[in-house]
């Protein structure tokens, strides 16, 4: 069996939580953590290696960009965090500069694996990661609407009493204010969502608003969101390293799906050892198609305005 190595850039709350989740859920041989604050990565490496007796042997170390050379995956969580009252798009200018300083040295190291991005605004930064790296589009992945979708399924579970494992519903579009729910195709416990009397139109509108605002509410209460997105990252890495063919709603490359080109946006996609092996284009109603087009247009406007 080949040696499995993950290179992590960003050791803040998302990065450190992801590192912990990864070691507990995926068998890897080496994890290298890179951050501008070297002292933190050194401390986390020492802390995380204590998991070995409980989860299995793994080399964990603080490193630099040269360590990305032989990694299977480069995970990017580094970036300015969203503060109360901010939208994810407010982070663009700052985080694009940070992203540029990360991608170049990773590519120069000889890295030939798969990029996985969670830094916000994730759809835009994933799009720019592909452009900056020149990597094939399937080799660049963003967490997209995987967290939004998890929040939607939790909310639907609360409303219906159905276990989240039996809820198949997606949030699509931007991981941000222009996201939307694909209610027409949603299935709850083998029945169409629309067949549930307790999920009338008014309730669904309230639920959609609650899902969209949940991240901001968490940030207002505790300063950041990190548990959910860290597990999203872990599941993506697991699918890549174990060739799982996992379907997740991700920042996926559009090559005509939904009428969108040259942009990463939230849509179900299949993750395998080769990265994104397929983008699943869901059937959308006329209204949902308009929402997807609007979401894409808003992000495309931002991307086109960035001078790389």
UniProtKB/Swiss-Prot annotation:
**Tell me, which GO biological process terms does this entry list?**
glycolytic process; lactate metabolic process
Q: Which SUPFAM superfamilies match?
A: LDH C-terminal domain-like, NAD(P)-binding Rossmann-fold domains
Gene3D superfamilies (UniProt xref):
Lactate dehydrogenase/glycoside hydrolase, family 4, C-terminal, NAD(P)-binding Rossmann-like Domain
Q: Which residues form the active site?
A: 175
Q: Name one GO molecular function term.
A: L-lactate dehydrogenase activity
Q: Which domain of life is it from?
A: Bacteria
Write the record's keywords in alphabetical order, separated by commas.
Cytoplasm, NAD, Oxidoreductase
Output the PROSITE patterns linked to this UniProt entry: L_LDH
Locate the residues binding substrate.
Answer: 88, 120-123, 148-151, 225
The residues listed in the UniProt record as binding NAD(+), with positions renumbered to this chain, are 14, 35, 65, 79-80, 101, 143
Q: Which reaction does it catalyse?
A: (S)-lactate + NAD(+) = pyruvate + NADH + H(+)
In what pathway does it function? Fermentation; pyruvate fermentation to lactate; (S)-lactate from pyruvate: step 1/1
Q: EC number(s)?
A: 1.1.1.27
Question: Which enzyme type, at the first EC level?
Answer: oxidoreductase
> What does UniProt give as GO cellular component?
cytoplasm
Record localization = Cytoplasm
The role this protein plays is: Catalyzes the conversion of lactate to pyruvate.
The family line of this record is: Belongs to the LDH/MDH superfamily. LDH family.
> Subunit composition?
Homotetramer.
Report the protein name in the record.
L-lactate dehydrogenase 2
């Amino acid at each position: 069996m080949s040696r499995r190595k993950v290179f992590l850039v960003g050791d803040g709350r998302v990065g450190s939580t992801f590192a912990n989740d990864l070691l507990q859920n995926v068998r890897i041989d080496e994890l290298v953590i890179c951050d501008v604050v070297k002292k933190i990565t050194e401390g986390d490496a020492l802390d995380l290696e204590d998991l070995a007796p409980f989860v299995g042997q793994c080399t964990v170390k603080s490193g630099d960009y040269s360590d990305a050379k032989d990694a299977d995956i480069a995970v990017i969580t580094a970036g300015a965090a969203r503060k109360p009252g901010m939208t994810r798009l407010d982070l663009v200018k700052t985080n694009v500069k940070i992203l540029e300083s990360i991608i170049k040295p990773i590519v120069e190291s000889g890295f030939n694996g798969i990029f996985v991005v969670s830094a916000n605004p994730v759809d835009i930064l994933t799009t720019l990661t592909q452009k900056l790296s020149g990597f094939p589009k399937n080799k660049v992945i963003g967490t997209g609407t995987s967290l939004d979708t998890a929040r939607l399924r939790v909310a639907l579970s609360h409303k219906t009493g159905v276990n989240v494992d039996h809820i198949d519903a997606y949030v699509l579009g931007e991981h941000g204010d222009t996201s939307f729910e694909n209610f027409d195709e949603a299935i709850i416990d083998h029945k169409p969502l629309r067949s549930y009397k307790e999920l009338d139109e008014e309730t669904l509108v309230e639920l959609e608003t609650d899902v969209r605002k949940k991240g901001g509410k968490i940030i207002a209460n505790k300063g950041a969101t990190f548990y959910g997105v860290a597990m999203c990252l872990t599941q993506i890495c697991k699918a890549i390293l174990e060739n799982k063919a996992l379907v997740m709603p991700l920042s996926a490359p559009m090559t005509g799906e939904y009428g969108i080109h040259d942009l990463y946006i939230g849509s179900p996609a299949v993750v395998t050892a080769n990265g994104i092996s397929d983008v699943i284009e869901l059937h959308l109603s006329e209204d949902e198609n308009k929402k997807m087009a609007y979401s894409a247009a808003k992000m495309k406007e931002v991307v086109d305005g960035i001078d790389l």
